[in-house]
A protein has these predicted regions:
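Cap/lid segment of the alpha/beta-hydrolase catalytic domain
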Residues: 98-202, 452-456, 614-615, 623, ...
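Short beta-strand/loop motif that positions the catalytic acidic residue
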Residues: 415-417
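Active-site-adjacent alpha-helix of alpha/beta-hydrolase-fold enzymes
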Residues: 425-439
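Alpha/beta-hydrolase fold nucleophile elbow
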Residues: 205-217
Length: 726
């Protein structure tokens, strides 16, 4: 709580009168993210709302839903699904006078491959509602939260219990204490299991028959997954920071393999008890926490939990965390096979270490004849695996292919994303592709959120709790709180350091923004007149990196974010810096890079980073993106794509794309992560091009290093801008 109070003087988020033609803003008062108690729901209330009998707007909720309960009971069971596999399920029920609340209550459900609760070394259990003492099944909400990490209701479940909701949390098959083996993450079978659990919920005497789902990251993705199975009674979902197109966001949508996800695969294998990690590793460290997944109530001696682990150890796919990595593409399987052969091992742990470390991979290629050429020739195509092209009823899914089913289910969706999340675009694509009731909030936060002493992260936890409650009150209890009568979109505009303010729009993208072109000019100047027949060159630095704690690493548990010296990073490639901005403006949407270039190698990776430099010389990262030249052919997206560039990336397109050479310039176009940022008078923009982001994407150093030449007259940066209204 003290951390929040320290931040209170920083919080101010008043909306100024909009310019003509701009969307009318929602009501925003002076933001007070330093709540006085965990159940405070007046974070963004305007002064008159604080005095009113009832109030309902983003971050402001009172008088519509009365808090009635101050305690809860947690019980844990095994629930069999249709094929008899037993899944571990926790049920949290509000208590009145020490007894579960009478009558049938609406249920909020959370479901994923993550642990539903954790047994700590002292015998206590960490839950979504704080911590419970050894053997304890009932607790005051206040006391459980106070015993938990941070003493806060970060998941908002305490608030839901207080307002008369039952909370159910389940572990997917093959994870945690659940039995069974996995058919890949986000599988069709996992969707059916989720449907079976909802059917079980609705058969219970305490359930009203109306269910909503909440959660972020995988827990957000699993909401879309379960909704695609159209379970009876699932009315609304609240998915946060959920990826949409796995190939594009997490796999290889630009042709460049994302390797940071190896840390996530390795971590989950350790938690599932099928791998042990490596001491001293940054990507796959040994687990020294001495924690375990919580047992169900009847499993007094832990034998059932251990039996579930033994079952998954018998499955080759479960034992090897690389399975999800390789099933998406034969080329990925060949990548792993080639590196394993060069190392003389089939064990996943050392292969992961080499894949993650560009120097280690380069050293291995120097020792293994022909390895560099074989790895360079690999292409990661969109149509290499069925999951990237169509819905899978059994195996792993690319959720974008399920969007039509989700819309057809009729479920209401509140998409919740952050401008500093790794999957920012995905949240916007979920909104664009849903054809049912929907709402969208894009905040200033990361994937976690877990940045210490950062107002933007505090806002994420505070606002999420309130918006969850407003959403489920409307859909599960029929409370007429107006959540669908407000503007459909809330979005934060980032300012200086951890500052931001809020805007609204009737739909995404907001109106009034027009593309502004910034030429890549001579003398590394961004903007101004184009440079006819001029070029700029640089040599690939394969160690160029935004570090090991980027927005991407934060998404897999390697946060908080911490970027390196961005001026030093700019010197590892080629950069263009604008003149100081005269009149301020807002930039909201996806920056787009257009390049005309030649290369000394037939294929090459291009990474772009967009930054803001204030009058004092402080550099702020805004966005980044990348493209492998062999994936430059554009094609139709299989979903609504917000008018952005879309790399075809299918095998036929790759085969039809000519290689790069040093004489014939080729056109590359790609988008960077969307953002919403205000630039003030005196600020400058900088665009940085490099040949690698060595700790985030697979980097295969070439010998000699690639030489790039950018043809300036046909190269530019396009930004969606409008005049600042603050």
């Amino acid at each position: 709580m003290s951390r929040l109070l320290i931040l209170a003087p920083l919080a101010a988020a008043l909306i100024a009168a909009p310019a003509a033609g701009a969307p009318a803003p929602a009501r925003f008062g002076d933001a007070d993210y330093a709540r006085r108690s965990w159940d405070d729901t007046a974070v963004l209330c305007a002064p008159d709302q604080r005095k009113a009998t009832r109030a309902s707007s983003i971050g402001c909720y009172s008088g519509y839903s009365a808090p009635r309960y101050d305690a809860f009971e947690r019980r844990s069971f095994y629930v069999p699904v249709r094929d008899g596999t037993r899944l571990a399920v926790d049920v949290y029920r509000p208590l009145a006078n020490g007894k579960p609340a009478e009558g049938r209550l609406p249920v909020v459900f959370n479901y994923s491959r993550y642990w539903r609760a954790t047994e700590l070394p002292d015998g206590s259990t960490e839950t979504y509602v704080g911590a419970m003492k050894p053997g304890q099944t009932q607790s005051l909400i206040d006391e459980a939260l106070a015993r938990g990490r941070g003493g806060e209701d970060r998941q908002g479940v305490g608030l839901l219990l207080q307002h008369g909701y039952i909370f159910v949390r389940a572990e997917a098959r093959g994870a945690g204490a659940s039995f069974g083996v996995r058919n890949g993450d986000l599988s069709g079978r996992e969707a059916q299991d989720g449907r079976d659990i909802i059917d079980w919920i609705n058969r219970q005497p305490w359930a009203s028959g109306k269910v909503a789902m909440i959660g972020g990251s995988y827990e957000g993705m699993s909401q879309h997954l379960v909704a695609s199975a159209a379970p009876k009674g699932l009315v609304a979902i609240f998915p946060m920071v959920a990826t949409f197109d796995e190939y594009r966001a997490s796999w290889s949508g630009s042709g460049i393999l994302r390797k940071y996800g190896l840390a996530w695969l390795a971590r989950e294998a350790r938690r599932d008890g099928v791998q042990s990690g490596i001491s001293g590793s940054t990507i796959n460290p040994a687990d020294t926490s001495r924690t375990m997944v919580a047992r169900v109530d009847a499993d007094v001696d832990g034998r059932q939990r251990e039996a579930a682990r033994q079952e998954r150890r018998s499955d080759p796919d479960a034992v090897n965390p690389m399975s999800y990595f390789t099933r998406q593409s034969p080329a990925a399987g060949e990548l792993v096979r080639l590196i394993g052969h060069a190392l003389g091992t089939h064990e996943p742990a050392p292969i992961i270490e080499v894949l993650y470390s560009t120097p280690a991979l380069n050293a291995l290629m120097e020792k293994a004849p022909g390895l560099r050429e074989k790895l360079t020739a690999l292409r990661f195509a969109r149509d290499d695996a069925p999951m990237t092209l169509q819905a899978q009823n059994i195996g792993a899914n690319n959720l974008a292919m399920l969007a039509p089913r989700i819309s057809a289910s009729g479920v209401a969706v509140y998409n919740w994303g952050g401008w500093r999340d790794f999957a920012t675009l995905d949240t916007l694509l979920w909104d664009a592709n849903h054809r049912g009731p929907k709402k969208l909030t894009m905040g200033p936060w990361t994937h976690g959120p877990n940045e210490p002493d950062d107002l933007r992260e505090v806002a994420a936890a505070e606002l999420r709790r309130i918006e969850q409650l407003r959403w489920v009150d409307y859909w599960l209890k029929g409370v007429p709180n107006g959540v669908l009568q407000e503007p459909a979109v809330n979005y934060a505009v980032l300012t200086e350091r951890d500052g931001f303010y809020w805007r609204t729009a009737p739909a995404w993208p907001p109106q009034g923004f027009t593309p502004r072109r910034w030429a890549l000019g001579p003398a590394q100047v961004l903007g101004g007149a184009g440079a006819a027949d001029r070029t700029a060159s640089f040599t690939a630095d394969y160690n160029s990196s935004l570090g090991e704690h980027t927005r991407y690493h934060d998404a897999i548990g390697l946060g908080p974010t911490a970027l390196p010296d961005l001026d030093a990073h700019a010197r590892t490639g080629l950069s263009w810096t604008s003149q100081a901005v005269g009149a301020g403006f807002e930039m909201t949407g996806s920056p787009i890079v257009n390049l005309q270039l030649t290369s000394s190698t037939p294929d090459a990776d291009i990474h772009a980073t967009l930054e803001k430099i204030d009058p004092a010389g402080v550099v702020t990262y805004l966005s980044d993106g990348e493209l492998r030249a062999s994936h430059r052919k554009q094609g139709p997206a299989p979903y609504r794509n917000l008018g952005l560039p879309f790399s075809d990336s299918r095998r036929a397109a790759l085969a039809a794309t000519p290689p790069l050479d040093a004489k014939h310039p080729q056109h590359l176009v790609f988008d960077l992560s969307p953002t919403s940022t205000r630039l003030r008078s005196g600020d400058r923009l900088r665009l940085v091009l490099t040949a690698a982001n060595a700790h985030t994407t697979l980097t295969i150093p070439q010998a000699p290093a690639t030489q790039f030449t950018v043809h300036l007259s046909r190269s530019w940066l396009s930004l969606p801008v409008r005049s600042s209204m603050r």
